[in-house]
């Protein structure tokens, strides 16, 4: 370890760069790709005391491991850093200057909307190859077909196959970073060879969620094949690298495969979504202590996001998962942004979203608090859809006039009071998650939920 490197504090996560078999009894052997947690620095700064995922402790060499970091906020990650979007033929030629054989980029076709153009510099000229999109496949010569642009570029990188040159050097779009490089740099890139995909456990618009095995551990894997969708999910994965809490679904790593897309690997939550868990068990199985525990689990996760200046924007029982040991964890960080961000998030779940967020796109921790109140109602109604018997188009006008849902059957009055505080129309008068957690802890300690 160089003298310049700062000492890693206890709790720092590292990922192994090489295998280490250990030479002394006190050493902790590990394999490349293992995640280790620093316990303490030793007298020799080149060695740390660390523990592995099963809790075994020992001494490790600092130069064999890499500190895991959050992917930097504000970086534009790209699976396709060579993709420049809507630029003209002339702009592409300027970008590929000075000429360098094999320098290339891909742009949207100006003459054929929906198609793409591969632009390749070759012996002082730029050749433009139309990429035809037909029957959900891409092709240049209508002989070889590809699922997506990444596959196509990968193919012509290994073999010119009729082009003027094979693709040698991507012209990276200014301001973007290749996703694979950034996940590797920050210690989150996993190896596809270590992952076995076992069975589909969920389907989404983006692709499949699969049960997987990563080095002997059960994991959940989001498999995203489509270029544009994968690009959107990169943002979710990069947010997850910055978050660590026992009530947030934990990212284990990311695999970027040119041939087959993006894989986001997270801890496996055996009991599925909280909304399904509540509906399938109901009042006869789940007592008041259990409902309050789930409420507190979610509140603690949200207090952590609040303290770290993140806004979830899509908090609902469908986006909370339940582990084998009945711990509720918040997931689905697809819309999560740093608090300062005001980006439009497209379609919003009307019944869960605060009025000011729907009306003015004003998202804040306080709009998450509104959603938490709706989630509490879901928990205490055992998974009912909020605002029963009110047509969707009438929900917002009624809420803005001050309408609040009645308490679910059997809901303790003190818990209903918490819900109503979350549904205060003025965001400034809603409680913080810190205050909400204190109120829920008080209810638990005094057994007021009975």
Swiss-Prot record:
Residues 82-171 form the SH2 domain. ATP binds at residues 201-209, 222. Keywords: Adaptive immunity, ATP-binding, Cytoplasm, Immunity, Kinase, Magnesium, Manganese, Metal-binding, Nucleotide-binding, Phosphoprotein, SH2 domain, SH3 domain, Transferase, Tyrosine-protein kinase. Disulfide bonds: none annotated. GO terms for molecular function: ATP binding; metal ion binding; non-membrane spanning protein tyrosine kinase activity. The modification Phosphoserine is found at residue 364. SMART domains: SH2, SH3, TyrKc. This is Tyrosine-protein kinase CSK.
């Amino acid at each position: 370890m160089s003298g310049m490197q700062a000492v890693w504090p206890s709790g720092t996560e590292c990922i192994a760069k090489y295998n280490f078999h250990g030479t002394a009894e006190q050493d902790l052997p590990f394999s490349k790709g293992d995640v280790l947690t620093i316990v303490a620095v030793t007298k020799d700064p080149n060695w740390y005391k660390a523990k592995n995922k099963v809790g075994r402790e020992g001494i490790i060499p600092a130069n064999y491991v890499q500190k895991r970091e959050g992917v930097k906020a504000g970086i534009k990650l790209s699976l396709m850093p060579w993709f420049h979007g809507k630029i003209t033929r002339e702009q592409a030629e300027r970008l590929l200057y000075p000429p360098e054989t094999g320098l290339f980029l891909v742009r949207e076709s100006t003459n054929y909307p929906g198609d793409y153009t591969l632009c390749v510099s070759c012996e002082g000229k730029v050749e433009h190859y139309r990429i035809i999109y037909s029957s959900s496949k891409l092709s240049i010569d209508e002989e070889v077909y590809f699922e997506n642009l990444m596959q196509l570029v990968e193919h012509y990188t290994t073999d010119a196959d009729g082009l003027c040159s094979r693709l040698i050097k991507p012209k990276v779009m200014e301001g973007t970073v290749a996703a694979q490089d950034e996940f590797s740099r920050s210690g989150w890139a996993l190896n596809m060879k270590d992952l076995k995909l076992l069975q589909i456990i969920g389907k989404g618009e983006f692709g499949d969620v699969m049960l997987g095995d990563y080095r002997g551990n059960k994991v959940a894997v989001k498999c995203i094949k489509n270029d544009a969708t994968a690009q959107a999910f990169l943002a979710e994965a990069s947010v997850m690298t910055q978050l660590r809490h026992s009530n947030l679904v934990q990212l284990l790593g990311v695999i970027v495969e040119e041939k087959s897309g993006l894989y986001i690997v997270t801890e496996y939550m055996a009991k599925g979504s909280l909304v399904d868990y509540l509906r399938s068990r109901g009042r006869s199985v789940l007592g008041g202590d259990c409902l309050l525990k789930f409420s507190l689990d979610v509140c603690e996760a949200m207090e952590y996001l609040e303290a770290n200046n993140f806004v979830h924007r899509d908090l609902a029982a469908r986006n909370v998962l339940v582990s084998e040991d009945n711990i509720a964890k918040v997931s689905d960080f697809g819309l999560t942004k740093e608090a300062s961000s005001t980006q439009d998030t497209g379609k919003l779940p009307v019944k869960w979203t605060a009025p000011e967020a729907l009306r003015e796109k004003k998202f804040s921790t306080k709009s998450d608090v509104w959603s938490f109140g709706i989630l509490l109602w879901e928990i205490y109604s055992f998974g009912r859809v909020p605002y029963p018997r009110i047509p969707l188009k009438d929900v917002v006008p009624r809420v803005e006039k001050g309408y609040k849902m009645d308490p679910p059957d059997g809901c303790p009055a003190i818990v209903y009071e918490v819900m109503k505080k979350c549904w205060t129309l003025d965001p400034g008068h809603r409680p913080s998650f810190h205050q909400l957690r204190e109120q829920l802890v008080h209810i638990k300690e005094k057994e007021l939920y009975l």
